[in-house]
Amino acid sequence: MKAAYLDCFSGISGDMLLGALVDAGLDFNLLQRDLAGLDLDEYELYEQKVLKQGIRGTQIHVHALEGHVHRHLSDIQAIIGRSALPPQVKEKSLEIFTRLGKAEAKIHGTDIEQIHFHEVGAVDAIVDIVGAVIGFWRLGIEKVFASPIHVGKGFVKAAHGLLPVPAPATLELLTGVPIYAQDVEGELATPTGAAIVTAYCREFGPFPKIRVERVGYGAGVKDLTIPNLLRLTVGELADEDKGQEGIREGEALTLEVNIDDMNPECYDYLFEKLFQAGAMDVYIQTIQMKKNRPAVLLTVQTPYHKLEEMRKILFQETTTIGLRVYPIKKYMLPYELFTVETNYGSAKVKVAFMEGRACTVSPEYEDCRRLARLTGEPLKQIYEEIKEKAKILLYSTKYPID
């Protein structure tokens, strides 16, 4: 699996991340062509190679051709929605802007639809966010890790006056994320950078086991006492080499609630909201409570930094008045996604490995369902053929199967 590690020793901002992606191999001309799909003609984009404390990096500049344009979230949603961008880029970009809107709304004590974006609604923020999403997509990065984030200290000038560092919206977005400050004055982590990194990253800590393929440095505008750079390392997760054992270990939180008085029709919508918000798993079990009442035990597994968001959804969308939270340790087999061709069409197959052998071969259900609807053939028949084709593919590539 292609992964990236963001080393945020000098914070993170949208332009620094975009610069790091370009420095790590994202084709700048291709990026410009992709961004042209936004149909915004109010800016010019250019790159510059700079030195920060003797380290070369790429600085991305977005030059606005018009005055500072303030936009509402609905304006940004309309721009992205009608764009010619790929669906996955649209979806992730909208998710990031929605995260920003929610954070701003909470800070200002208003509804997300009433938020009037200032810096976030400017064209440079739109280009930074959509450009970063394009970069991860173009480089084939499937998983993102990050270090604890250096946020800086002091005050920063904003539309509402002087704000403490980290800015309130930044701190809200970084809830549950490890942050720190050293003797560096100024805003190092911006709301845009915080929104992007928390939308992509579920694990904040030291370097994962990764086979380094390329490294990029994105440069900030300020000159600091430390290199004002964001370092991006891209490569294959070493744990997920098909020929390696590499059982991965991780940590998460489990949230539990007992519910005996909720309309069961509401669970479908609840599951959808939890997964969209970043839940790792959601499931229910039948239980029996006091007074012999039939009920369900609703369980949600979530990354640490998503705790507040999950808690809010559970209290808003269920009838519970309390919940339990437990830290858990997870062990996961490395896996890879293969695409196989069948008489019905192409489909993805997830293959898990242990001790150098393929131990689980699972066709992706959504692909199987799509082919069943397309051809009218039985779903189970399509599932089995895809599974057999996958085994043949694995044999042909010399990976043993249990």
Swiss-Prot record:
Catalyses which reaction(s): Ni(II)-pyridinium-3,5-bisthiocarboxylate mononucleotide = pyridinium-3,5-bisthiocarboxylate mononucleotide + Ni(2+)
Segments forming a coiled coil: none
EC annotation from Swiss-Prot or TrEMBL: 4.99.1.12
Gene Ontology BP, a term: protein maturation
Top-level taxon in the UniProt lineage: Bacteria
GO MF term list: lyase activity; nickel cation binding
Keywords: Lyase, Nickel
Family annotation (InterPro entries): Ni_insertion
Pfam families the record matches: Ni_insertion
HAMAP family for the chain: LarC
Family per record: Belongs to the LarC family.
Task performed by this protein: Involved in the biosynthesis of a nickel-pincer cofactor ((SCS)Ni(II) pincer complex). Binds Ni(2+), and functions in nickel delivery to pyridinium-3,5-bisthiocarboxylic acid mononucleotide (P2TMN), to form the mature cofactor. Is thus probably required for the activation of nickel-pincer cofactor-dependent enzymes.
Protein name, per record: Pyridinium-3,5-bisthiocarboxylic acid mononucleotide nickel insertion protein
Primary gene name: larC
